[in-house]
């Protein structure tokens, strides 16, 4: 739980700006606002222009003061916001006066924590608030806005409702065997289990596909040494991030940079050239390259049109086949130079010249990124949420055999575990909810 006191913090980012907001939450919020403004006529949800004074009765600033009366506030408590002139000094001076009047500094995330304990938000909304502040792309903002609106909460509630249904009927079967139950109840339960499993599996698949929407999709550029990987990276970034040299093995480590493609943020990884290397440091770089490929959402495989397809190129082609689950864009570089490369070994490819722009590659990247981000599938935005869904699926899987064999106590145990797992996404599971369903659905003790 949290302390039942009054907290204060600056709600806007540090630095120079036109406006700063100081937020106060707790039972003494209105009292403190009255004290430091010498006004007592604040009305809920109305902005009042007020002069803010320090303890020596000297003017600090003129600010708009907005009072949110409990429970109609973000935290569910009395909240006062001081919208003062921007900059570091003024907002800190107001915070000092609020502290002198009886508040304490808020801990990181404490306003959201209070909102959670006062049932103003659930854990999914708390996570969305945290991540939307750090969002770097329009994709991320749109995805997190859906979670803020309650999309994931509604999804979890539907799963919980079905699991509570199963558990309620199972408990009745165990404790009140003489009760008349629907003849097809176990068939209903089995069907619900199948539907839940499919929903959760689809959600996990969509979430893995869209994982890069929040942090940025990882794009690995691979190819043998001196094929033009660093040059391509620099063209994508529009500045010289990687050293360009005719000497094979110049890039000995992975280089990672972020860039915007359309509405998407991608993290481009320029890998060390993949070949049989004798240099120890270069070998480490190649190992990191292979790791980068394994971790990438999209792979750009680069080949040199002006050189024959050799064993090193074939090694790259083998890597592509080994990573067939990934989106791979094959690029035949230096297409304006004399053709030496056997194009028949490539199923499909994009040609890039040394003189023209890379728009064909940009368009292909955008198509793949769009396909990963568009759609109405429920998406999990944190590892905590993913783990909760995985555990729910696992326990539903364990419950199947006891249901078939009639071992209802074991079945109830695994369904209870699944219920606790899925509930942890929004807020901890309360066993009283299951009892409410059980006693509400059946006439026990008639």
Curated annotation (Swiss-Prot):
The gene it comes from is mnmE
The protein depicted here goes by the name tRNA modification GTPase MnmE
Q: How does it assemble?
A: Homodimer. Heterotetramer of two MnmE and two MnmG subunits.
GO BP of this protein = tRNA methylation; tRNA wobble uridine modification
Protein EC = 3.6.-.-
What does the similarity note say?
A: Belongs to the TRAFAC class TrmE-Era-EngA-EngB-Septin-like GTPase superfamily. TrmE GTPase family.
Starting at the broadest rank, the lineage of the source organism is:
Bacteria, Pseudomonadati, Campylobacterota, Epsilonproteobacteria, Campylobacterales
Q: Which organism is it from?
A: Aliarcobacter butzleri (strain RM4018)
Q: What class of enzyme is it?
A: hydrolase
Q: Which residues form the TrmE-type G domain?
A: 216-370
